[in-house]
Structure formats: C-alpha cells, structure tokens
Amino acid sequence: MPDQPDSTTDGQPQPSLAARLRAARVAAGLTQQAAADALGVSRPLLVAIEKGARETRPEELLVLARLYGRSIHELARPAPPLEAFGTQFRAALAAAPEAGQLQGTVDELERLGDDYLELARLAGATLPRRYPAVTDITGLDPQQAAEDLASNERNRLGLGDGPVLSLRELLDEDVGVRVFAPQLPSHVAGAFVYAEPLGGTIAVNANHPYERQRWTLAHEYGHFLSSRNRSEVTVLRRWERVPAAERFADSFAAHFLMPRAGLHRRFHSLSRDRDGDVTAADLLQLAHSYRVSLQAMILRLEDLRLLPAGSFDRLRDLGFRPSEAEQLLGLPRPAPDQTLLPPRYRYLAAELYVRAEITEGQLARFLRLDRVNARRVVEELTGSQDVGPDGDVVPLRLAEGAR
C-alpha cells in the first residue's frame, strides 16, 4: 500500500510532482480519461494536474499512487523524473520480437534509474562520469572503426593490451555507465539507453552465461561510444544481413575484450611452447584467461589469421565439448553475474540506512528485496572481520548504528 502523505503541497502547484504523475500514468499504460475516471474528476482537470496548473490534493495523490502502482515517496520526489525510457526504446522495441515482454523490463529499468538518482540526492553524492566524446562512425568500415575505437578506449582507460578482468566494475566505477542485471527473456542479451540526468545505462541478462554477459556488456558499450542517443535492444537472432551497427558493436566487443597485440603475443608464446602444435585444451585455457567463450576466442584467432578459417566448425563437428574439457582441466566455471544493482547503488542505500535517513521498508524497496535480505546486504556492505586478542576471527562492525 502506498505511504500516507503528510502534506503534498503548500497550496502551490509542484512541477516535479506534476511531471512524475504524468510519467507514472504513461508507464502504467493508462489514458488521461481512464485516470480521470478512476480519480472521479473530469479529463480537463486531470490535464491541469499533470501540467502543474492545479495542485494535487493528498487524497488524490493516494488514489493515483495506487492506480499507477507507485509509492507516495516516488511520486513526491523533488527532482524531475528521469527521461522516459519507454519513449527512447520505442523504435528498438518495435523491431524486437515479443516486445510486450520487454516493456515491463523497460519500465522497471527506468524506475531503477530514478531510484539511483534519488539515492544519490539523499546521500548528497554525485554519480561519477568519465565519458569520452561520441565517435561518429558513419560511412566508415565497421570492422576498422571498431578496432580503432576499441584501441583508443583501452588507452584512455589505461588498460594496456591484456585481458579486461572486471568489465562491469570498470564501466561502473571508471566510466560511470550504470550497469544493471535484470531477468530478461532468453532471446534478449541486453539493452542500452542514454537518458539524462542518469547518463548511459546498460542492462545485461542475469540468466545468460558469464562470458555471454561480458560480450553483451562490451557490445552495448560500443553502441554507447558510437551512437549514444540511439537506444538499443540486443536480440539473439539469425540475420539474413547483419546491420552495419550490429557488425560494428560485435567487432568492437571482440577488439575490446581480445586486443590484437596482446593476443598475438600470447598466442605466439603458446605456439612456441608447443612447437607449433596448439591443442583445443590450450585454446580453452586461453579463452578462460580472457574470460570469453571458446567460440569467441577461436573466431577471434581466425579473424587475426592465427588459426585457419573454419577451425571452430571443425572442432564442433568432432564433438568437442568445452564444458567437459573445463572439468578435465580443472578450470573453474564462472557463475553468471546475477547482481541486479550496481555496487555504488547498493552502497548508497546501505549508507543511508545506517545513517537512519531511510527506513527499513524503504531500504528493502530500493534493493528490490524483502527486509531480511535487505538487512543482510547492509551487513555484508558495512561489516568486516578482524582478529581478536585471543586470536579468534571476530566481526568488525562499521555500521553499529544500523537498526
């Protein structure tokens, strides 16, 4: 049930409230007439409320909050709402199969972004950004443009030419792209949108394998660098003719995750050690070190002409099973990253709870968890361990004031 409002207005219209009411209605898929009927007012009066020309009374706000499935706290936030993701995703969703399944995800992603901004506002924090200028690749060869941009971006971020180990943390902390991992339909790898004042936002499918998630992250980051104002939904499909933008993004992912110079050096070193006889097990270990799939690694080596074309197809036809080989080689199988929220988002929520600036119920809503698990997250983020005088490991609480 929505929170009870203390006082929604001081007799003056609130522009941010009016804008949030309109955005919530649109996200709920309701017409102005339907909302007016539920409120028991005329449509022109609802229009006046949404324009901020007429103040919203407390009892009206309660009705609209219930109708739109929002809390009073969401609707009464003093900041204007985030740019509507649904509007930006309209073209991308129109081209995607089963768009209806994705609309709910888009709406929830927008609410997560708005919650992120609210947490930052309450904490007095600034969400970091270190964005490069957009690179226009119009008219350029997609593969060459992708390699050039990937090389430039790795240099900008000081990555050298080795594997990128913690890609999500890199984008979140060093670049300031907000990365979420929601549950998506199996045929959807991820999505990208740019909306102020949040900035670049990427969603990756929490149910996909770890290597696929990293590829999707790099793919969407390529879109962010080259076409920031065009939202993208990446659907796994067989194209008759792959669009240039998708060829660019996939090529960017390959070059960013497996840069030419570093991979050349590692492969030639491996080849020398094996007297030129590189095995499937060697390739699997190489893929593991770069945290990509065996298929992605072999196709990249084919692209660099370090392996003959068709090597992956031949290996597959021979019945080679990467998962079984990983077990035999003792290579750990990385679990998918199913952490819905960015680290900074969770830290802000925990900090505000510890400082008693949000309630336990609000904490749970921000973290999308029940109260027990929300408190557990706070314990994990604000607690550590130390060694006591008797040599025993004891908890070290950094948040003794937490309720």
Question: What are these model-derived regions, one by one?
Answer:
Residues 1-403:
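Short juxta-domain linker segments that transition from a proline/glycine-rich
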